[in-house]
Design a protein with these regions (language model features):
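Amphipathic alpha-helical segments used for helix-helix packing
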Residues: 88-110
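Hydrophobic alpha-helical connector segments
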Residues: 52, 66-91, 139
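Helix-turn-helix
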Residues: 6, 10-48, 52
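Short alpha-helical scaffolding segments that buttress acidic/His motifs in well-ordered protein cores
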Residues: 81-84, 98, 102, 139, ...
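Short amphipathic alpha-helical elements of helix-turn-helix/winged-helix folds
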Residues: 10-14, 87, 142
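Hydrophobic/aromatic-rich alpha-helical bundle segments in the mid-to-C-terminal region
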Residues: 111-116, 120-123, 129-174
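Short, basic, alpha-helical segments at the C-terminal edge of helix-turn-helix-like DNA-binding modules
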Residues: 55-61
Length: 174
């Protein structure tokens, strides 16, 4: 892992635990375990730190979802929602970091672009896993809804989304 990736990983953890508004750049420097000069060399603004953290988390999340992935179809969807539940429990108990960044920086074009790219990639992955590109946007909404509901509902949100996804892809919903 390069120094920049290592810093992005530590920034991801800091933002995940403390949110985007609370940590100052000095606190982020401490969390990244580098000097302020080194931090700014790799990420010249707090917004670029957010983008670096989001990019790192995006790659980590997609790798996590693909780990042990069965062939496209029902088993792959079940796998995805089970992995989502594990991710929420262990890595995102407060909800989706990308959406938190979007809310914290609503007008920042680079952050909006990073979040939008993450969401587009999720729709593409759902299309591939389900083998049903026609329902991928609806599957995406189930994925996002489960992520958003996690802090209140926990595993019940995941189970409900998985159940609805299976009904949707099997054609039991109109």
């Amino acid at each position: 892992m390069s120094l920049q990736q290592d810093i992005a990983s530590r920034l991801e953890q800091a933002f995940s635990h403390r949110g985007f508004a609370e940590p100052s750049v000095a606190e982020l420097k401490t969390a990244a375990e580098v000097s302020l000069r080194t931090l700014y060399r790799h990420f010249p603004s707090k917004e670029s730190m957010v983008i670096g953290a989001l990019a790192h988390r995006h790659a980590r999340y997609l790798d996590f979802l693909r780990e042990g992935l069965p062939a496209p179809g029902k088993a792959a969807l079940v796998h995805l929602f089970q992995r989502l539940g594990q991710w929420m429990k262990n890595d995102a108990p407060h909800g989706c970091l990308s959406m938190s960044a979007f809310v914290a920086f609503p007008g920042h074009p680079d952050i909006v672009d990073a979040v939008s790219q993450h969401k587009r990639d999720m729709i593409q992955l759902l299309a591939e896993l389900s083998g049903r590109p026609d329902v991928a946007p609806a599957l995406f909404l189930l994925h996002e809804g489960a992520s958003a509901a996690w802090p209140l509902m926990g595993e019940h949100a995941i189970h409900a989304a998985e159940h609805a996804a299976l009904q949707l892809t099997e054609g039991n919903l109109s």
